[in-house]
A protein has these predicted regions:
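Glycan-recognition and catalytic cores of secretory/periplasmic carbohydrate-active enzymes
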Residues: 1-237
Length: 237
């Protein structure tokens, strides 16, 4: 429930909905994460509350999960549309890191966690792959020259490895060589995949993406939530 203060942020002087406050907050975040998050070795730093990079100790590895670089690409593709200076550099570095560090050139797919020295966690997670698709779609929307390569690759991986047509949803997790790690299914990864599929449809107009998004919505909402008095189950098999 919104209070009066929140409502005033989200409305203009006439009381009509406004994006001005949201745009201001987005700009603050772009400025906060901007160049400070760029790791000179590749990928991105996590930042502390003051905006300084949280560099690991000398002996620690700089672990970078897949959803880190992919989210940076997505967010700074939006920043590019805002005209934010330096957004292209963030997108460049993110796409290069995803392709060169996270991508498994031998077995296909994308490792869950890596450092600049190699693979930390070789698992192939649906959650992370959903964000690869989102990053590729966002980069394509701003016409980045590396977007199509990533988009073509991740679409093939999702179609061949993750998608279960008989269920209308994604499998959850695999080993590096695509051995299933569990029978678990989750709403969270499928929710993020739905977002990414809609984004991919928006930039390609390929109805295959929209059809998959609708199938997930049918499973999670029309079947699971309906049978649970419209509560959305998080975990299922």
């Amino acid at each position: 429930m919104q209070n009066d203060e929140t409502q005033s942020f989200l409305a203009d002087e006439t009381g009509q909905p406004s994006n001005a406050w949201l745009n201001e907050q987005a700009l603050l975040l772009f400025n906060f994460f901007g160049p400070a998050a760029l790791n000179p070795k590749g990928g991105f730093w996590a930042l502390g509350r003051t905006g300084d990079p949280l560099r690991p100790s000398f002996a620690a590895q700089e672990v970078q999960p897949l959803h880190n670089a992919t989210r940076f690409v997505h967010c700074f593709s939006l920043a590019h549309r805002f005209g934010f200076a330096g957004a292209e550099r963030m997108i460049d570095q993110g796409l290069e890191f995803i392709w060169k560090q996270h991508r498994d050139a031998q077995h296909g797919g994308y490792y869950w966690a890596v450092s600049n020295d190699g693979v930390i966690d070789p698992a192939k997670q649906a959650y992370g792959h959903a964000f690869v698709l989102l990053a590729a779609a966002a980069a394509k929307e701003v016409m980045h020259p590396l977007a199509d390569r990533l988009l073509d690759d991740i679409v093939e991986v999702i179609e061949q490895r993750f998608w279960e047509p008989e269920r209308g949803a994604s499998r959850e997790e695999f080993s590096a060589d695509w051995q299933a790690l569990s029978t678990y299914r989750g709403q969270n990864s499928n929710m993020h995949l739905t977002e990414a599929l809609i984004a991919a449809f928006a930039v390609t107009k390929d109805t295959m993406f929209l059809q998959k998004a609708e199938e997930i919505a049918y499973l999670i909402i029309d079947r699971h939530a309906r049978s649970a008095q419209w509560r959305v189950p998080e975990h299922f098999d």
